[in-house]
């Protein structure tokens, strides 16, 4: 635990501890193939005998903003708000652009985990490993932590399957080292939000814009929003016939979803909490060849029957999403041989309802969560319903108080700083100088507020009064802290030019040695 933590100050510090790791874009078929090939020795060692659930199914649409923003509350796909990246008004009262959706998704996360989004980009990906290891020191401040591993997703989109698999294997290496350092009483859950489809890249947005500009208001794969007065059935059929999309569904009436695939017409009929599937033409899902007899089934029955097929529980997923007031009038999907090619997703993508998109692993270990690995099946949106004993988004009651002292050999002065934290994210302090150890002068008083915190860094802004000059003056300050386990680097910039750069090393939970401006040596005691 770092000396900057607020150890013991969290009202939930006696609650069970949990690290919840969101492993982006790894489906069960990929994970199982990598385990069987011997490429995931740590996952196999830690989870394969018990604790690896391979029969979980995620949301449709299998898109990151929809899943992240809804899963914590156990929200179903029929009611979740953030259904895609680009959304017309509906329940929001205004259109949501890609930038709006990204911000809403980021703000739905635990505060210290939001920077994981940037760390998933190739340019910043080197910080991801450091951030993960830093979570080991944050459990006293945050008994329940969330961590988002985006590397596989980002590299799958940008670089393709080979680099994607390298990042999946890299996760195995990193998680092995991490769990070996994790205390046995700390629970861990690793879940994936969706898979990643490679193959032929097809530019669906260009196809829709070129051929359906008169009918379609917005297309954000897999959802299609139509202009007023456009016939849904005619458009859905044309979409399948005139684009690379394989499936298109719409609500024929309140109880029936109708769709098209090549020369087949497909129906999902709802009655008394159950759904029946029927088709005119070939069965693209192969349900009737695998034990289905045309009866009405519950959602769980559909999942049990189809979890090992190419299109698991598709009737449930499509019908549920079409009930969502923010969904488009038509919902679509590619098969697992093609992906939607965009500016961001040049080499791979996801979002549809194939097994490669939606069958995801859940890995668990720990005294309070181990039983989840024994489930026969799991709808991913129900995962958080199993975690009622954990409190998410809790924060410390306050930050640490501290006293620091350092001797500056260039000026022969000793400076002592006393800081008090009345509440979390606030600190008040005073700097006192002792010249030649004879007498004391109040140098400055200050207050600061934490505006950014991640697993790696913290940024404070504040102000105060400088008494060291002939004329007392006010000052503004910005302070940045960067931490890697026991080592930290701190930069303080002030308008009174009392700028500082400090390197620190924690030799105990509450005690660190410091070097400031490469001329002053001292210590810091946290309380």
Feature locations, PLM:
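Short glycine/proline- and aromatic-enriched beta-strand/turn motifs that initiate or cap beta-hairpins
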Residues: 393-437
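Repeated loop/turn-to-beta-strand initiation elements of outer-membrane beta-barrel proteins
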Residues: 424-430, 452-461, 483-491, 499, ...
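Short, structured active-site-proximal loop/turn typified by the sulfatase FGly-forming signature C/S-X-P-X-R
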Residues: 31-79
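Active-site neighborhoods of enzymes that stabilize oxyanions during catalysis
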Residues: 219-371, 380
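His/Asp/Glu-rich, glycine-adjacent segments
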Residues: 59-165, 170, 273-308, 327, ...
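Metal-dependent active-site segment of extracytoplasmic phospho-/sulfohydrolases and closely related
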Residues: 171-206, 328-333
């Amino acid at each position: 635990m770092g000396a900057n933590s607020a150890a013991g100050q969290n009202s939930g510090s006696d609650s069970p501890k949990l690290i919840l790791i969101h492993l982006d874009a790894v489906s069960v078929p990929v994970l199982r193939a990598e385990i069987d090939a011997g490429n995931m020795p740590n996952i196999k060692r830690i989870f394969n005998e018990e604790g690896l659930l391979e029969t979980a199914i995620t949301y449709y649409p299998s898109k990151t903003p929809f899943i992240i923003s809804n899963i914590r509350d156990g929200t179903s796909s029929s009611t979740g708000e953030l259904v895609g990246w680009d959304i017309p008004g509906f329940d929001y009262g205004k259109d949501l652009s890609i930038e709006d959706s990204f911000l809403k998704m980021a703000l739905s996360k635990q505060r210290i985990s939001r920077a994981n989004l940037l760390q998933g980009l190739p340019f910043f990906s080197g910080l991801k490993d450091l951030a993960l290891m830093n979570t080991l020191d944050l459990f006293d401040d945050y008994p329940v932590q969330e961590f988002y591993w985006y590397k596989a997703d980002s590299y799958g989109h940008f670089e393709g399957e080979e680099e994607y698999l390298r990042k999946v294997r890299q996760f195995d290496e990193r998680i092995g080292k991490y769990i070996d350092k994790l205390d046995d009483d700390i629970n861990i859950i690793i879940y994936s939000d969706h898979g990643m489809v490679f193959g032929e890249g097809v530019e669906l947005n260009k196809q829709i814009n070129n051929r359906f500009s008169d009918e379609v208001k917005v297309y954000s794969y897999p959802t299609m929003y139509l202009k007023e007065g456009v016939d849904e059935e005619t458009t859905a059929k044309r979409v399948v016939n005139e684009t690379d999309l394989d499936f298109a569904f719409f609500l024929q009436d309140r109880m029936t979803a109708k769709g098209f695939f090549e020369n087949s017409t497909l129906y999902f009929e709802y009655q008394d909490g159950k759904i029946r599937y029927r088709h005119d033409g070939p069965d693209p899902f192969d349900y009737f060849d695998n034990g289905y007899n045309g009866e009405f089934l519950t959602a769980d029955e559909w999942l049990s029957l189809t979890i090992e097929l190419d299109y698991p529980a598709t009737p449930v997923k499509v019908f549920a999403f079409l009930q969502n007031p923010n969904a488009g009038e038509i919902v679509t999907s590619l098969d697992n041989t093609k992906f939607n090619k965009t500016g961001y997703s040049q080499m791979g993508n996801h979002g549809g309802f194939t097994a490669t998109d939606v069958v995801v692993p859940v890995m668990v270990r720990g005294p309070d969560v181990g039983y989840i690995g024994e489930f026969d099946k799991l709808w991913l949106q129900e995962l958080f319903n199993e975690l009622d004993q954990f409190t998410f988004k809790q924060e410390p009651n306050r930050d640490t108080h501290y006293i620091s002292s350092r001797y500056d050999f260039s000026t022969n002065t000793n400076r002592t700083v006393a800081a008090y934290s009345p509440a979390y994210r606030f600190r008040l302090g005073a700097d006192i100088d002792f010249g030649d150890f004879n007498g004391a002068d109040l140098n400055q008083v200050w207050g600061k507020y934490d505006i950014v915190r991640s697993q790696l860094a913290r940024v404070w802004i504040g102000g105060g009064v400088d008494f060291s000059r002939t004329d007392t003056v006010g000052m503004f300050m910005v302070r940045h802290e960067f931490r890697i386990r026991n080592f930290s680097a701190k930069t303080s910039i002030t308008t009174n030019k009392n700028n500082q750069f400090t390197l620190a090393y924690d030799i105990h939970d509450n005690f660190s040695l410091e070097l400031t401006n490469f001329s002053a040596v001292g210590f810091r005691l946290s309380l």
